[in-house]
Amino acid sequence: AGVIHDERGFLAMKRSENQPSPGKWEFPGGTIELDESPEDALLREFREELSIEVSIIKKAGVWQHTYPFFHVDIHVFLVESSELESIQMTVHSEKKWISSSKDFDLDWLEADIPIVEDLLDKFY
């Protein structure tokens, strides 16, 4: 997952109705393909999901979550981009800049909630 943070806050994305967990908010990202590093997967996912290039600033950590039928390890990176005004959403229906603890009160994807809590602790 990639967390974009700038003067507007953090960028959150809402999943489209035709996606798994429709209407849930998340940080952009996706599945790591075979023979792909987490970093390369992140860069590819931003191109596929938002049609932008990003640069990785640093790795924020790895969060684990177990759903009823599968387990995920979420590699989280802080990223930046000069193309944020050019975002074209392919799997999301809405974007939102989050700039206060109140703004974080969204219907988050379950696996992203610990990431959100960590960001709240560090920034708000």
Regions found by a protein language model. Name each.
Residues 24, 86-124:
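Nudix hydrolase/Nudix homology domain
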Residues 32-33, 65, 103-104:
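Short histidine/acidic/glycine/proline-rich micro-motifs that form metal-
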Residues 1-11:
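Conserved N-terminal beta-strand and adjoining loop/helix that marks the start
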Residues 53-54, 62-86, 96, 100, ...:
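Active-site-adjacent beta-strand/loop module that shapes the phosphate/pyrophosphate-binding cleft
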Residues 9-48:
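Conserved Nudix-box catalytic region and its N-terminal flanking loop in Nudix hydrolases
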Residues 47, 51-58:
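A SAM-dependent methyltransferase catalytic signature shared across enzymes that methylate proteins
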Residues 2-3, 17, 64, 68, ...:
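Short secondary-structure boundary/capping segments
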Residues 5, 22, 27, 69-74:
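Short connector loops at helix/strand junctions that flank enzyme active sites
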